């Protein structure tokens, strides 16, 4: 029974280093894959580069993790060597050394548990760092996309303004043409009116001077009426012969407002005019 127990312990001790080596190899491959992915991320264009401080902190954390992994590997190698030497000693030693080997196997199991826990922690930290890097990259991409959309909107607005300027110029030209056409039509209408209503001739006719004076005098009389004597004197004046004005109608020669003679005015013209104090005057 003791021999069976010893053989089982030896087989377990020999099998454990191989599992640790496999775990170490798998951790190395994962680290290489993560490093390759990080390199691909770093190879992206310059406008997607992260802030220097943030990148430096990430690199420091990575270096610490790699140092911890190296320490774990060294401890695993040393433990494997120790186990190999112990197995060689167990083969050469007698049954008295079985108790000592069992005592040595117990602390080696605790060390392996600690190593496994450290590896799990390192993997968790690496995954967290990768997530942070991806999140920062997504934020930068979103900001760049927003800037590109704003620039595109500004360019579209500028193009719309440039396209609108010719239309405004056309509208101004059309308005100017309409105003010119309106002015031309007004000038044409004025010329037609001048043709249908010609101006009075500006030639001087001396025979027509007296009717014009009579018309002006009648307008003044409407404002300031004359006395009876003045009316009589004005009515006695002889009119020129109408034979001289045969080429023109009669309404051009006589005023529109005719002044009729009253009998009192005619009688007053034949009375002698004397001053009121004629009795006191001395006759020479």
Curated annotation (Swiss-Prot):
Residues 138-197 are annotated as: 10 X 6 AA tandem repeats. Residues 21-44, 78-111 are annotated as: Disordered. Pfam families: Casein. The keyword Phosphoprotein applies. InterPro entries: Alpha-s1_casein (IPR026999), Casein (IPR001588), Casein_CS (IPR031305). Residues 24-36, 78-99 have a biased composition (Low complexity). One of its GO terms (biological process) is response to dehydroepiandrosterone. PROSITE patterns: CASEIN_ALPHA_BETA (PS00306). Sequence repeats lie at residues 138-143, 144-149, 150-155, 156-161, 162-167, 168-173, 174-179, 180-185, 186-191, 192-197. Residues 1-15 form the signal peptide. Belongs to the alpha-casein family. This is Alpha-S1-casein. It comes from Rattus norvegicus (Rat).
């Amino acid at each position: 029974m003791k021999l069976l127990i010893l053989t089982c312990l030896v087989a377990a001790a020999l099998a454990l280093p191989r599992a640790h080596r496999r775990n170490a190899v798998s951790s190395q491959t994962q680290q290489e894959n993560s490093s390759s992915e990080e390199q691909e991320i770093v190879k992206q264009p310059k406008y997607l580069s992260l802030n220097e401080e943030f990148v430096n902190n990430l690199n420091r954390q990575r270096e610490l993790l790699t140092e911890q992994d190296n320490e774990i590997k060294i401890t695993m190698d040393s433990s494997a060597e120790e186990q190999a030497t112990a197995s060689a000693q167990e083969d050469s030693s007698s049954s008295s050394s079985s108790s000592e080997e069992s005592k040595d196997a117990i602390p080696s199991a605790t060390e392996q548990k600690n190593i496994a826990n450290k590896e799990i922690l390192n993997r968790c930290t690496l995954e967290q760092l990768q997530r942070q890097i991806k999140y920062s990259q997504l934020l930068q991409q979103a900001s760049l996309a927003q800037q590109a959309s704003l620039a595109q909107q500004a360019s579209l607005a500028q193009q719309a303004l440039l396209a609108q300027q010719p239309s405004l110029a056309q509208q101004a030209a059309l308005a100017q043409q309409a105003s010119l056409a309106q002015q031309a039509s007004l000038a044409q209408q004025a010329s037609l009116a001048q043709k249908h209503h010609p101006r009075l001739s500006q030639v001087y006719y001396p025979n027509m001077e007296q009717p014009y004076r009579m018309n002006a005098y009648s307008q003044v009389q409407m404002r300031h009426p004359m006395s009876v004597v003045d009316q009589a004197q004005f009515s006695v004046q002889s009119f020129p012969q109408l034979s001289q004005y045969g080429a023109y109608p009669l309404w051009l020669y006589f005023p529109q407002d005719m002044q009729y003679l009253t009998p009192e005015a005619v009688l007053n013209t034949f009375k002698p005019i004397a001053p009121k104090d004629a009795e006191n005057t001395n006759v020479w």
